[in-house]
Amino acid sequence: MTKIDPYKSKEAWIKWKAKTQSIPGLSNINSTLILKYLDDMERGINVSILSKKGGRSYIRLKSSKSKLLFLIKSFQDTYNVDNIGNLTEEQLINFFSDMRKGAIKRKDGGIYKSVRDFTKNFKAFWHWYQKISNKAGKEIPDITVYLDSSGTKPDWVYLTESQVRLLCDNAKFEYKALIMFLFDSGIRAPTELVNVKVSDLINDCKELNIREETSKTFGRRIKLMICPELLKEYIKVKNLKSEDQLFDICPSVINRNLKILGKNVFGDEKSLAGQKYSEITMYDFRHISCCYWLPRYKSESALKFRFGWKNSDKIHYYSEMLGMRDTISDDDMLIDITKTEIEQELQKSKREREIQQDQIDTLHLQVQKLAEYIKQLEFNIRSNFN
């Protein structure tokens, strides 16, 4: 089964490249630079030594393209920079500062919430530009040194377990299975989700195999603890075969219907994670699942494995510690030395009890032997008198 691309990123990328000899709205120099940069990123050439080797994904390429085209065109229009190499550090800092303040707005009039993403994309481009210029014998200063790459995390929808079940109770049957599967597995949706086949469900739907070739990071086999029975019913009702997609869905349609369901069940209020219930999407269930499993897993490494994470900071990013509870106990208040002393005393008492028990057993055995001796003595005396 070929990996399914729910966003059709590869198809869109190839189509755009085929029809684009130069980029409309950009000067020849800037257009040539952007096309060369994107081509290098696709092939994995001239990338930072700190970055992973190999070409960038089509999703990443599309995202970089859209952000860079916006930035370079804005620099042209705002600062009359027909050669991006002539952009100054001050111009760059001022532009991104205006983006953060809301002086530069989106086409719909809204404020840019993820300025950090634009910053990171431009930094990557500029460092590439420095590298290729250096190879050509021209030294280019790093004007991105003081560029602020920090940013606030986007709001998301938080649901408790009881709220997830309430949402499920009010959903159509197909959505019940999807909601509980997302909640239980914490799978990346839609990218990993749409690539799950029925045959990836193992051990009577109690385990899920997320294949290496379909995962963003690494393949993994995880346990399903909440949704197995619902999945079995879903597969039976839908008459799905082994090689069928478990959820053959259109992500935009699913997300639209989830938002309607969220509003109908919870209203238009904000959840604890800042986003309105009426804005819930499949992606939110990865956050929600992390919050559910975090206090239940005994080790951080096991939790990271379940969610396909390599770095521990993802745990806080996805959970923000929502749903956590204080599990401190009286036993935890004993420092290691005190606990060791108590354990030693308990061990000593145990040994003393064992010695006492041995002494009692020995005494009991001696009493038994004495009783037998007296009994035999009485028998001998009676025999002599007779």
Where would I find each of the regions flagged by the language model?
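Catalytic-site neighborhood detector that most strongly recognizes the C-terminal catalytic loop/helix
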Residues: 214-216, 307-344
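Active-site/catalytic core of tyrosine-dependent DNA strand-transfer enzymes
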Residues: 225-277
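Short, charged phosphate-coordinating catalytic segments
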Residues: 133, 182-205, 301-302
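N-terminal core-binding DNA-recognition domain of tyrosine recombinases/integrases
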Residues: 38-154, 186
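Short, polar N-cap/turn motifs at the start of nucleic acid-interacting alpha helices
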Residues: 202-203, 278-279, 298-319
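C-terminal secondary-structure termini that scaffold catalytic or DNA-interacting sites
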Residues: 2-20, 331-386
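Conserved tyrosine-mediated DNA breakage-rejoining catalytic core shared by Y-recombinases
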Residues: 195-233
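Basic, Lys/Arg- and aromatic-enriched nucleic-acid-binding interface segment
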Residues: 161-190
